[in-house]
């Protein structure tokens, strides 16, 4: 009897290990439903390509600019879904690698990677940046920021400022870049990636880890402020690049306060105006004495989709106008402020519904296109091994400084020692902001030097772009895995009674 029980236990152990292995490697199992769906998607892609080719002509043929963008979007979407089967790896990692492969693999490079029109790529990346900024503004919880103002401020400004300074100071001797480019690189590295951190954090929160100490709320709130700060700092520093190269550094100095004040004021007024002309649904009571005096009816307002279209259109107008005026930083700050002001006019529920529409647009279209384009913009043949090695060293040094300052900034409150270590780990990943911003200096340099790819400003901007992509490739997968693995070991799990009280 005992022998049979032992055999049964061993069989169950083998079965559990097999099931665990299958869950760890889900790509080896493709269900008939998944295969059918993949074939339908492929058929749809081919049908769309045929229709577009008949309508457009040579632009949709291999080596054509529209064909290149079409293939990049499809391949990046597929790569993102593939990588998503291996949580906690973010889909954006696969999308970035897909674009990088399309540019640097012989055969694919000539047909797709090099065929992307630079001006079209810049415009599409700016549009994707607009989606990022609008989502950041809508998700900026002013009440939560005020409630957690001191710990959130320490965590949002301290680590980013320290990392930006460390990278800028070290980049001067390591890469021999001008100080303006060093400052831009510092703020490019400084931003956290909510797209990488928040999903892993929410999975831990659902299991009860860190809920009692308020770690998810603190990290989420501080991350939104950190993104705003890093984008504003990058934009202000980027405004000095071409102006300083042309000998007008003194004239660029006045742009920093002008961009900050002007962008914030313009964004606030635009957001309030947009909120006023796109009101939410509201109930109106008729006047006393009318036939319908005892019945209230609803006056329909704008739908979430229309609000999202209004807000995104206004944001793109601000961004492209700011680019023409060489005030990218002020325009980016203005979009964030406008989105936050409009969200306050609409109310929390309507702003969340508008954000849901933009989330669909981001996940299904803007994100795969942005990361594929930024990956396809990196040409490894134009980089030296010394530059890549120096970039890895700068990234490592910046992360060390950032982690230490984040650990110190998380102190002074109710967080335990291990929880402060987790916050420092969660403050490492980089992805979305780097992908959106890394190409802006290159766009400005190409415009300034008339498309000369061998110009000094263009070469420096290519180094900044390559290091931004390198930061994503290294920190996005490692950071997501580190947050997921360390969370269950460093955070305290709330008891059932604690979770119920937090939900109430």
Model-predicted regions and their roles:
Residues 2-24, 288-293, 494-504:
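Non-transmembrane, juxtamembrane loop and terminal tail segments
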Residues 26-42, 88-91, 303-305:
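N-terminal membrane topogenic signal
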Residues 43-53, 74-81, 99-104, 234-238, ...:
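Hydrophobic core segments of alpha-helical transmembrane domains in multi-pass membrane transport
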Residues 55-61, 83-90, 99-151, 278-393, ...:
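Membrane-interface junctions of multi-pass transporters
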Residues 59-73, 117-133, 180-193, 255-269, ...:
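Structural signature of hydrophobic alpha-helical transmembrane segments
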Residues 75-86, 107-112, 142-210, 273-276, ...:
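Transmembrane alpha-helices that form the ion-translocation and gating core
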Residues 95-106, 154-168, 221-232, 304-320, ...:
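Small-residue-rich segments of transmembrane alpha-helices in multi-pass membrane proteins
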């Amino acid at each position: 009897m005992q022998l049979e029980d032992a055999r049964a236990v061993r069989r169950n152990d083998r079965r559990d290990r097999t099931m665990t292995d299958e869950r760890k490697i889900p790509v080896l199992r493709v269900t008939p439903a998944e295969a059918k769906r993949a074939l339908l998607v492929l058929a749809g892609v081919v049908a769309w390509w045929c229709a577009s080719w008949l309508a457009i002509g040579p632009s949709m043929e291999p080596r054509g600019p529209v064909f290149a963008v079409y293939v990049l979007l499809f391949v990046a979407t597929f790569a993102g879904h593939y990588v998503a089967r291996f949580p906690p790896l973010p889909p954006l990692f696969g999308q970035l690698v897909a674009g990088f492969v399309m540019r640097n693999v012989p055969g694919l490079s000539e047909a797709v990677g090099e065929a992307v029109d630079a001006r079209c790529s810049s415009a599409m990346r700016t549009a994707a940046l607009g989606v990022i900024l609008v989502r950041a503004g809508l998700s900026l919880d002013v009440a939560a920021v005020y409630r957690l103002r001191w710990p959130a401020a320490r965590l949002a400004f301290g680590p980013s400022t320290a990392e930006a300074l460390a990278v800028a100071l070290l980049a001067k001797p390591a890469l021999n870049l001008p100080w303006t480019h060093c400052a831009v690189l510092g703020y490019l590295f400084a931003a956290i990636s909510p797209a990488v951190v928040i999903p892993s954090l929410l999975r831990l929160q659902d299991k009860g880890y860190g809920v009692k100490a308020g770690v998810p709320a603190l990290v989420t709130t501080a991350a939104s402020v950190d993104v705003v700060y890093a984008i504003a700092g990058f934009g202000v520093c980027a405004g000095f690049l071409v102006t300083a190269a042309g000998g007008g550094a003194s004239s660029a100095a006045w742009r920093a306060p002008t961009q900050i004040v002007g962008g914030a004021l313009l964004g606030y007024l635009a957001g309030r105006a947009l909120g006023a002309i796109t009101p939410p649904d509201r109930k109106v009571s008729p006047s006393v004495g009318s036939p319908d005096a005892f019945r209230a009816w609803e006056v329909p307002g704008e739908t979430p989709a229309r609000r999202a279209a209004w807000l995104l259109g206004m944001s793109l107008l601000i961004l492209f106008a700011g680019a023409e005026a060489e005030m990218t930083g002020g325009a980016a700050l203005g979009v964030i402020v406008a989105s936050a002001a409009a969200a306050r006019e609409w109310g929390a529920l309507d702003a969340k519904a508008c954000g849901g529409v933009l989330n669909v647009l981001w996940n299904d279209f803007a994100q795969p296109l942005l990361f594929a384009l930024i990956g396809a913009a990196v040409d490894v043949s134009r980089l030296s091994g010394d530059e890549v090695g120096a970039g890895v060293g700068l990234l490592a040094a910046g992360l060390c400084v950032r982690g230490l300052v984040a650990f110190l900034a998380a102190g002074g409150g109710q967080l335990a020692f291990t929880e402060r270590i987790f916050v420092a780990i969660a403050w490492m990943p980089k992805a979305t902001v780097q992908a959106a911003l890394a190409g802006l200096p290159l766009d400005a340099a190409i415009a300034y030097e008339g498309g000369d790819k061998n110009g000094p400003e263009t070469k420096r901007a290519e180094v900044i772009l390559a290091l931004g992509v390198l930061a994503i490739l290294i920190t996005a997968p490692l950071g997501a895995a580190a947050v997921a693995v360390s969370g269950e070991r460093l955070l305290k799990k709330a008891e059932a009674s604690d979770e119920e009280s937090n939900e109430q």
